[in-house]
Amino acid sequence: MAGKELERCQRQADEVTEIMLNNFDKVLERDGKLAELEQRSDQLLDMSSAFSKTTKTLAQKKRWENARCRIYMGLAVGIALLILLIVLLVIFLPQSSKGSSAPQVQDAGPASGPGE
């Protein structure tokens, strides 16, 4: 009876030992996976930081390009308006000055002298 009881306790101890070894192996495997996940998360963090810097740099570059384009367009419109103003002044100013500077002769009808 004591031998059977001892055998049963030994089997239970062996089962518990086997379960503990399996659990220990699973913990080691899980630890390896966690380390890999941590490494991947660090890589993703680095990549997101680089992406953020690149995005900010690109946005700033595009803003400057857009501002430069607006400045060039404003200058082009300003120059076009200036040229149009000069052309209009050249066309209309000499005609109005010729008409006002030349003596105007008014026709008073048939010439009547003092003796008539």
From Swiss-Prot:
Region Disordered, residue ranges: 97-116
Membrane topology according to the record: Single-pass type IV membrane protein
Record topological domains on the Vesicular side: 94-116
InterPro entries associated with the record: Synaptobrevin-like, V_SNARE_CC, Vamp5, VAMP5_R-SNARE
Alphabetic keyword roster: Cell membrane, Coiled coil, Developmental protein, Differentiation, Golgi apparatus, Membrane, Myogenesis, Phosphoprotein, Transmembrane, Transmembrane helix
One Pfam family in the UniProt entry: Synaptobrevin
PROSITE patterns per record: SYNAPTOBREVIN, V_SNARE
Compartments, as annotated in UniProt: Cell membrane; Endomembrane system; Golgi apparatus, trans-Golgi network membrane
Modified-residue entries (Phosphoserine), positions: 41, 48-49
UniProt-listed GO biological process terms: cell differentiation; Golgi to plasma membrane protein transport; muscle organ development
Cytoplasmic-side positions: 1-72
Family: Belongs to the synaptobrevin family.
Task performed by this protein: May participate in trafficking events that are associated with myogenesis, such as myoblast fusion and/or GLUT4 trafficking.
Name used for this protein in its record: Vesicle-associated membrane protein 5
Organism (species): Bos taurus
Top-level taxonomy: Eukaryota, Metazoa, Chordata, Craniata, Vertebrata
